[in-house]
Amino acid sequence: MGEFQRNENKHKSWQQFFLYPLFFREDLYAIAHDHHLDRSGSSEPTEILVSNFLSFLTVKRSIRRMRKQTNSISLFGNSDPNKLIECNKNFYSKSILEGFTIVLEVSFAMRSKHFIEGMNGWNSLRSIHCLFPLMEDKLPHSNYISDIRVPYSIHPEILVRIFRRWIRDAPSLHLLRSILHEWKNSFSRENLQKALITQIENTRFSLFLWNSYVYECESFLIPLIKRFFNSQSLLYGSFPDRTHFDKKIKDIVLFPRKISTKKIWLLKDSFIHYVRYGERSLMALKGTHLQVKKCRYHLFHFWQYYFHLWFQPYRICSLQLSKTSFSFLGYFLHVKMKPLVVRVKMLDDLFITDLITNELNPIAPIRAILFFLAKEKFCDISGWPISKLSWTSLSDDDILDRFDRIWINLFHYYSGSINQEGLYHIKYILLLSCAKTLACKHKSTIRVVREQLGSELFTKSFSKEKFISSSFSKTRSQRERIWNSEISQINPLANFWQKMQNKQIEN
C-alpha cells in the first residue's frame, strides 16, 4: 500500500510538468476569449464580434494542426481577401494564443513561487519608488555603478530551451516552437529579435516571454555575482575611527603576514547591490576598479556563452559615482559630497570636526519635460504656454480634470527631486495652457475666463490640497524627501525621456 501511494505521488508530481491536458479544457479558452473581448472593447465592429463564437471541437483540431510545423495555422497573419473571414481568423488565433499564454503563466507562477520561497531576504514591493530610498541608503557608500541594458536579441530556440527546463511534455514544446518560428516568419530580419519581446499586438504573450527571459537571466546571474562578491561586510568607510577599527580586524581575522591592512580593506569591504526596472539594471559596487572590470568581463561572457548572443559593448557602462551622473527611472542621479560639522566632547574639552558624507541627489529632467510638453502642444519650443486645440470640443470639467491629472501625476512622480523650482515652472505652463484652452473654446480671453470661473480654475485644477504647501516646503529639511508609495509604473514623461536617452546611446 505504501509503495502504491509513493507511485501515485510520483505520478502526480510528474503530471505537474505536463501542460497539454490543459489545452483541451473548454473553460480555459472561454477565459481567454473573454479576456480578448475585454481588451478589444468597442474598437471592433459589432458584427465581427458576434460572429466569433467559440467552438471547443475546432480548438482541439486547431491545436492538433499547430503541432505540425508543416501544416500549422497562421497566428500572426492572414492573406484571405475576405475581410470578415480574415478578422475572424485573426481574432480566433489570438484567443488560442491567449489560452496558451494562460497555461504557461500558471506553470511559471508555480515555478517562480518555489524559487522566491527558497531565497532568503526576498522582498516584493509594488511601488517603483521603493527603489529610490534603497538607492539613497546604499549608493552613497558605493564608488562604482554599472548601468546594464538587458539584451533582447535572443533566438527563438533559446527561449524553447529556457522553457524546456520546467516543461517536460513534448507537445507543449512543439506548440511553443511553432508559435515562435511562425512569429519569426511574420517580421523582417532587422526587427525580428526586438519583435519577440516588444510586439504590440500580442501584449500578454510578449510580456510573458520577456518576464521568463529576465527571470532566467537573474536566476543565474545574481548567484554568480554573489559568488564573485562572496562576503557581505559592514560599511567600514562609514566609521570615523578608522584606525582603531583596523586594529580590531587585525585581532579577529586570521590572515597571512604578507597581506597588509590596505589589502584587508579591499578584500573585506566589497559589496554589491542590484536593482532592475524593465530592461534597465543597476549594480552598485564598493570595490576596486579591477573588481569592476572583472564583473563586466563575467557579464559579457555570461550572455555570450549561456544565451549564445552578442552582448553589445554599449549595453553595459561602468561609471564612477563621484565624477559622473546617470539616469534611471526618469531621474538624473548624482552622488555629491556633503560636509557635516560634528561636535565631539572628550572629558572637559569640546572639539569641532568636519565629516565628509555622500548624499544622493535626484534631479528631475526639466528640459526633457518641456520638450515633451512642446511635442504634445501644451507649449512651444521656448516653453511659452499655448492652447490645446484638440481638447476644445470637451466640456469645461473634462478639460480641468485632464490638466489636473497631468499635473498631479507629474508632481507625484517627481516629488523626491531636489529641483522643485523647475516643477513650479511646469505647473505655471500647464495652468496657463489650461486657461488658454478654455478661452479658445469660449472665444474669449484669459482674463474673461478667470473672471467667469474665479477661484474654480485654481481649486478644481491644481488644487492646493494635493500639492505640498510652500510653508511646509520651506520648513522641512533639505535632506528629507517625499517618495510617493502609490507609483506602480513609470511616468509617461519619464518613459519618453528614457527612450530618448536609449536612442542617443545606441546611435
UniProtKB/Swiss-Prot annotation:
Q: Which domain of life, per UniProt?
A: Eukaryota
Q: Its Gene Ontology biological processes?
A: mRNA processing; RNA splicing; tRNA processing
Task: State one molecular function term (GO).
Answer: RNA binding
One GO cellular component assignment for this chain's record is: chloroplast
Keyword tags: Chloroplast, mRNA processing, Plastid, RNA-binding, tRNA processing
Report whether RNA-binding shows up as a keyword of the record: yes
InterPro entries xrefs: Domain_X, Maturase_MatK, Maturase_MatK_N
Provide the gene name from the record. Answer: matK
Q: What does this protein do?
A: Usually encoded in the trnK tRNA gene intron. Probably assists in splicing its own and other chloroplast group II introns.
Which family does the similarity line name? Belongs to the intron maturase 2 family. MatK subfamily.
Q: Where in the cell is it found?
A: Plastid, Chloroplast
Q: What is this protein called?
A: Maturase K
